[in-house]
């Protein structure tokens, strides 16, 4: 028999073994001691089992395994079983979730993953660089085209829409796809370098598949999905569709409601690392440890560990985001390694010399960091980096 295994943090150590047994039974067969011997024999294979309990710093930690045949093969069933009504039951946090290998046929994970995305843009030996459209709400397609051209001119690898740039009359998604196709192709013809542009998916959940396919026909090369406002099973269905043949970026919008509390909700590495990887994201965005919405470094690095965990599904690219500027690049490489994405909005568009110079400053900082050269030293001969460091400084 195979199991789904979940670990929880409780706000108390009071009667921990008893509490663990109550949870294991309450989320499976409901009761046990009230059953007669025959009923217990019949239900034994459906019963949750306590694997481990321990106490640490005044908190209780319990691990429970649930028979995999208790659930249907979807995230709704899995999460409702392991943390549905339990999430309402006082100070309790889901800190780890492991699915059995038998689930891989229904949870195949990312189409591309780290190596697939790298292959698309032919960049294999460094972190990827991504920038974000900024200030495009209320602007027209000409403005969007100019921003895309400027970001590409600096040598960016990936560009994504803002997560709040939905399909709209001023910049319709189909037109953005066509512009992206034309600008990316022109960039390739000029430089020989490929890049991807991720368009935000929006609209009715029942129309998303058709929308993505129309966008691909129009030239879309990647998508940004607000996964937690749509649901993990929506991501899974999109990623599993063979006709949706471009990478999908997972955005963490709404996830703060689940990860922010140290006592409640779902641990950030599970919600933004494990689950998007299993659901089929190729990249997963999350708050960096450095910005104004900073996530604790151990949690941010934990997300990256889960995103790049080697197992039955492809590894995916971790994307620490928010508050990123060129002076952070060496720290980012140190904290997240080369299989990661350096993602900036204001750090690109806020460069005093413009967005193209902003991207170039990131490239210069990255080259220096990978060569083991200090950013201060590199800035003495590279103006774009010098101007960026004057504006933002160096974070260590």
Swiss-Prot record:
Substrate binds at residues 134, 160-163, 251, 323, 345-346. The active site is at residue 85. Keywords: Amino-acid biosynthesis, Isomerase, Magnesium, Metal-binding, Methionine biosynthesis. Its EC number is 5.3.2.5. Its cofactor is Mg(2+). Binds 1 Mg(2+) ion per subunit. Pathway: Amino-acid biosynthesis; L-methionine biosynthesis via salvage pathway; L-methionine from S-methyl-5-thio-alpha-D-ribose 1-phosphate: step 3/6. The modification N6-carboxylysine is found at residue 160. One of its GO terms (molecular function) is 2,3-diketo-5-methylthiopentyl-1-phosphate enolase activity. InterPro entries: Diketo-Methiopentyl-P_enolase, RuBisCO, RuBisCO_lsu_C, RuBisCO_lsu_C_sf, RuBisCO_lsu_fd_N, RuBisCO_lsu_N_sf. It catalyses: 5-methylsulfanyl-2,3-dioxopentyl phosphate = 2-hydroxy-5-methylsulfanyl-3-oxopent-1-enyl phosphate. Homodimer. NCBIfam families: PRK09549.1. Belongs to the RuBisCO large chain family. Type IV subfamily. Has no RuBP-carboxylation activity. Catalyzes the enolization of 2,3-diketo-5-methylthiopentyl-1-phosphate (DK-MTP-1-P) into 2-hydroxy-3-keto-5-methylthiopentenyl-1-phosphate (HK-MTPenyl-1-P). This is 2,3-diketo-5-methylthiopentyl-1-phosphate enolase. It comes from Exiguobacterium sibiricum (strain DSM 17290 / CCUG 55495 / CIP 109462 / JCM 13490 / 255-15).
